[in-house]
Amino acid sequence: MENPANANPIRVGVIGCADIAWRRALPALEAEPLTEVTAIASRRWDRAKRFTERFGGEPVEGYPALLERDDVDAVYVPLPAVLHAEWIDRALRAGKHVLAEKPLTTDRPQAERLFAVARERGLLLMENFMFLHHPQHRQVADMLDEGVIGEIRSFAASFTIPPKPQGDIRYQADVGGGALLDIGVYPIRAAGLFLGADLEFVGAVLRHERDRDVVVGGNALLTTRQGVTAQLTFGMEHAYTNNYEFRGSTGRLWMNRVFTPPATYQPVVHIERQDHAEQFVLPAHDQFAKSIRAFAQAVLSGEHPREWSEDSLRQASLVDAVRTGARDIYFP
């Protein structure tokens, strides 16, 4: 993809003052030469003002007012998942490119409709799975292609976190909270990244907290048509885990901190073959910065990779299958 180095920066407006925007996305947008934050909207003006005092741009009260601005070319959407479909649609119809936090929507039909709107208007809609832009995964894929563990027999991935405070948005099912949409989408997306487009749902268990009617953990089993399985674990009532592992015909390969590595973290690839073990230390990278750069380059070049939308739609199908096909366990 061409790097439009001499292009004017994309003027970005932010809809929603979420924690992920404050900690990760806005610092990356501010540091990226191809983007300029021109406006930040919140339903509360004082909250928008606090964000702009740190990251620049104009504070805007209310999301519709931001979409009416002429100084906004693209919109970043870090809202709760249940609000994504409405505000992505409104942003696209206002002529803005959109970078939306994962999950893009809460189901595949909504995602299909939004990508259709984007195509009709010649706009980019990108789901921000930032971990996909870290080079460590390409390096792992290259090692696997070289046969470091033989033929891949199975894949396992886990992303679990300890319980959050009682009022945390993850426990609010009415705004798209819950472990599946907030956390489970990561191992599902990793399975698709490495095992390909023919992944199928086999089974799942979702553990619901009865009082709040929210999913707090789960496991899913997927398979390729050749019988390579993906065993996925996710939850928010666990010890912290953040890893994936491949088992092959002659060995295994695994890594930790695969989904949310800090920008200064040097990933370590572990490989075991019979009585032989080795480690490879990979360079540190800022995956948020790389995600922002990929979005900006695609907007400025006009090249909107079709595989991005196709991957997002396959992901949405798998998440839908896990949600609707799972055995639901309620406690206490």
UniProtKB/Swiss-Prot annotation:
Catalytic activity: dTDP-4-dehydro-2,6-dideoxy-alpha-D-glucose + NADP(+) = dTDP-3,4-didehydro-2,6-dideoxy-alpha-D-glucose + NADPH + H(+)
Keywords tagged on the record: Antibiotic biosynthesis, NADP, Oxidoreductase
Keyword rRNA-binding: no
InterPro entries according to UniProt: Gfo/Idh/MocA-like_OxRdtase_N (IPR000683), Gfo/Idh/MocA_domain (IPR050984), GFO_IDH_MocA-like_dom (IPR055170), NAD(P)-bd_dom_sf (IPR036291)
Active site as annotated: 102 (proton donor)
Residues that bind NADP(+): 17-23, 42-43, 63, 79, 84, 170, 182
Enzyme superclass (EC): oxidoreductase
Pathway terms, separated by semicolons: Antibiotic biosynthesis
Record: residues binding substrate: 24, 240, 260
A GO term for molecular function: oxidoreductase activity
GO biological process annotation, one example: antibiotic biosynthetic process
EC assignment: 1.1.1.384
Keyword NADP listed: yes
One protein family per Pfam: GFO_IDH_MocA
Protein's job: Involved in the biosynthesis of L-digitoxose, an unusual dideoxysugar attached to various pharmacologically active natural products, including the antitumor antibiotic tetrocarcin A, and the antibiotics kijanimicin and jadomycin B. Also able to reduce dTDP-3-keto-6-deoxy-D-galactose and dTDP-3-keto-6-deoxy-D-glucose to yield dTDP-fucose and dTDP-quinovose, respectively.
Family to which this protein belongs: Belongs to the Gfo/Idh/MocA family.
Subunit structure: Homotetramer; dimer of dimers.
Protein known as: dTDP-3,4-didehydro-2,6-dideoxy-alpha-D-glucose 3-reductase
Organism: Actinomadura kijaniata
